[in-house]
């Protein structure tokens, strides 16, 4: 996906997540690749290049019992059912970003409640750790929170317009 179209998609599909946060999270999770698949405790030899290839790969991983995450926001297969996703819908960019919003909002709510009167930025960082790992510590230890924070500070590059 061209990163220049991402802001409009994020606004339409995950409006409760600040655009900079959504962009940074997706940059780290999938590098804006809607067909990205991350295998927990493993790796693919190469990432799928098409929707059909992504679907076939994800179904094979599921059938083999692997734990994996898919799409722009790298939604984990263990969350599909509760988020109302299927393998097919999880690769739809808007559905994936909506799921990202749900998981991140749940994590933010937990972080805000877990730390008495936590500052919003502390809660956001804890929510990012939770998004990554399901808890408030692993994302810090593995450097995930730092990666997203660095990506959030990165200035998006402008793409030159084609001359007509």
Language-model region placement:
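Non-catalytic cell-wall polysaccharide-engagement segments
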Residues: 1-21, 31-36, 44, 48-73, ...
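Flexible glycine/serine/alanine-rich "lid" or loop that lines and gates the nucleotide-sugar donor pocket
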Residues: 27
């Amino acid at each position: 996906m061209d990163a220049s179209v991402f802001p409009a998609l994020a606004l339409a599909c995950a409006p409760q997540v600040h655009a900079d946060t959504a962009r940074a999270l997706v940059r780290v999770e999938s590098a804006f690749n809607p067909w990205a698949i991350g295998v927990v405790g493993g790796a693919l030899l190469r990432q799928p290049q098409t929707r059909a290839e992504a679907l076939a790969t994800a179904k094979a991983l599921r059938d083999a019992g692997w734990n994996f995450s898919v799409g722009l926001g790298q939604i984990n297969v263990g969350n599909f059912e509760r988020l109302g996703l299927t393998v097919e819908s999880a690769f739809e960019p808007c559905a994936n970003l909506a799921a990202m919003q749900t998981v991140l909002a749940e994590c933010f709510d937990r972080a805000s409640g877990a730390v008495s009167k936590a500052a919003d930025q502390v809660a956001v960082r804890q929510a990012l750790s939770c998004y990554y790992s399901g808890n408030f510590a692993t994302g810090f230890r593995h450097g995930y929170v730092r990666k997203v924070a660095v990506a959030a500070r990165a200035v998006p590059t402008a793409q030159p317009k084609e001359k007509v």
